[in-house]
Amino acid sequence: MAEFNIDELLKNVLEDPSTEISEETLKQLYQKTNPYKQFKNDSRVAFCSFTNLREQYIRRLIMTSFIGYVFKALQEWMPSYSKPTHTTKTLLSELITLVDTLKQETNDVPSESVVNTLLSIADNCKTQTQKSTEAKTTIDSFLREHFVFDPNLHAQSAYTCASTCASTCASTCASTCADTNVDTCTDTCASTCADTNVDTCASTCADTCASTEYTDLMDPERIPLHIMQKTLNVPNELQADIDAITQTRQGYRAAAHILQNIELHQSIKHMLENPKAFKPILFNTKITRYLSQHIPPQDTFYKWNYYIEDNYEELRAATESIYPEKPDLEFAFIIYDVVDSSSNQQKIDEFYYKYKDQIFSEVSSIQLGNWTLLGSFKANRERYNYFNQNNEIIKRILDRHEEDLKIGKEILRNTIYHKKAKNIQETGPDAPGLSIYNSTFHTDSGIKGLLSFKELKNLEKASGNIKKAREYDFIDDCEEKIKQLLSKENLTPDEKSQLEKTKKQLENALEMLNVPDDTIRVDMWVNNNNKLEKEILYTKAEL
């Protein structure tokens, strides 16, 4: 059988799309793209066990990370309306201060046109801020309804069962009567209320509520707040404090726990005396803590799983058309051989080179009698070996994944760089204390290390002008290179040549700083008494 040539097949299809492809060619094409190549059969049988719980974990991991990203993006999002920029209350106060300053400097009220202009700008700023707040509030409400577990919405306490049953039955009957004819409604309401409300709900409520009326289901050791608030005999001087403590479950539990644990009294006293020292420690900004504050309810997972299962084929087809991964890359494994564990690595290396032309994918060593984690751990990734052309499909997938990560990081870095430049142009450089604040409160969260200190410094030096900031970066690199070369005692000829070249580049870069943004510099050489002198002209740039 002739060797299959996929390039020739593609060429023929492009030249004549109506050309029929034989079944044998399709089989060869499938075998070429199928990573599960058949290995040499063996009469021995290996007994093994495996679990596929990773798929369920990946779904939850994706859901958790997606929810965390959405809430984080909402915090950083600034909606766009008629104006692309949105001014905060800080600028509003600055405008008011400007009006007061003008009054003081001129000892007179500014002209009516100036005042009206400033007030108009201030009013627009206030309007934009209000619109942004309203939009964020609406989106936050939507996200919390679907993505945040709220026990008050998803699990009612037992002592509210009676009122819940009554209101549910009444509303159900009312809505049913509105949509159904009278005869049917009468029978439905009667049977529903009789069966559900009397038999089920009444008995359940009676038994449960009787035993839990004076018990907090979420904290059985303590009396529920609604009971305590009715029975407490509080002196007038303590009434305000007791009301504040018993207003929420969290406050009551915290106070009760502190009172019952004497060893905490001194520590709590120190914490209240120095809250700034304790707050960064107890309320850290790690991403794990942030994600744990947004726990998706179980019904969201159910709805998401239902959506995937109901549209599984369509989702696979869409994923296949968007991404390079094939949808038939399911979980699978093959056992090649069994070797003595005392010389495991040596045997594996020998196996690699002996069967390198037949092995399609990477080979991993698995200790018999022990569970082996197959996840994408660093130790597992370092063991991957590629020896032949048969594994090109999987290798391309992994290489593409690594390349996408690099490209995505560079795109994100450029986006941050341009947004930071725009921010400096609009509001000026960062406040002096911002770097200290970020180092104190944002050490483990957010984007770290994408922009260097030198880049930020040069952006501020250039007042947000990206062209000049790049030139400052180049000047710093040249000066650093010259400094390194001059620090050496004896330079090689190549290093001397590099030093002279770098000095010229530095000189040209310093001259380019004076070139306006809307012009192009043209160097001209003029013969002056048999001596060439450089003159510089500027021409208008076409934007």
UniProtKB/Swiss-Prot annotation:
It is found in: Host cytoplasm. Signal peptide: none annotated. The keyword Transit peptide does not apply. Residues 161-212 are annotated as: 13 X 4 AA tandem repeats of [CN]-[ATV]-[DS]-T. CDD domains: TIL (cd19941). Belongs to the asfivirus B602L family. Keywords: Host cytoplasm, Late protein, Repeat. This is Protein B602L. One of its GO terms (cellular component) is host cell cytoplasm. Induction: Expressed in the late phase of the viral replicative cycle. Sequence repeats lie at residues 161-164, 165-168, 169-172, 173-176, 177-180, 181-184, 185-188, 189-192, 193-196, 197-200, 201-204, 205-208, 209-212. Plays an essential role in the assembly of the icosahedral capsid of the virus. Allows the assembly of 3 molecules of hexon protein p72 and formation of a thermostable trimer.
